[in-house]
Amino acid sequence: MSIQANLKEVLSELPTGVRLVAVSKFHPNEALEEAYAVGQRIFGESHVQEMTQKYETLPKDIEWHFIGHLQTNKVKYMAPYVAMIHAIDSYKLLVEVNKQASKVHRVIPCLLQIHIAQEETKFGFSFDECREMLDTGGWKDLKNVRLSGVMGMATNVDDDEQIKREFCSLNTFFKEIKQSYFSVS
């Protein structure tokens, strides 16, 4: 199935209001251009250098989302253009994103990465670490980042029930912190 046919099929199955982030890492520009031709405008990359090269050569109305583990020393390269960072896994990284976003007069939306998997190779805050970071309140002073939600990577297993439990725990945690730290009262 072609990229265009596959993308049209996936998009037809999405509920209204859901936006698709097409993972484009390791794919050549030609593949992204094919997806772009049928209307895909949001692409996800996990390597800063590859994302920057694609940003420089592809249409400027593309929204670039960073979806991989991010080192603090790489933030400065993407701060001028990244639309969202999906993997904030430490307060130190959040502070660095704020610093680099401030330099380019931007507010960068970010997702807190929560470690929900049974694998040590995955990154992210534990539930307790995230609560502690939010409790300290320092994040409220970071004016150039916007905490927009949470994300997690489930364990890489064939057990659908385990995967479901892990994502259910993430959903429960999201509802908890949304109520405790982000509710408008």
Language-model-derived ranges and their functions:
Residues M1-S185:
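Conserved alpha/beta-domain cores
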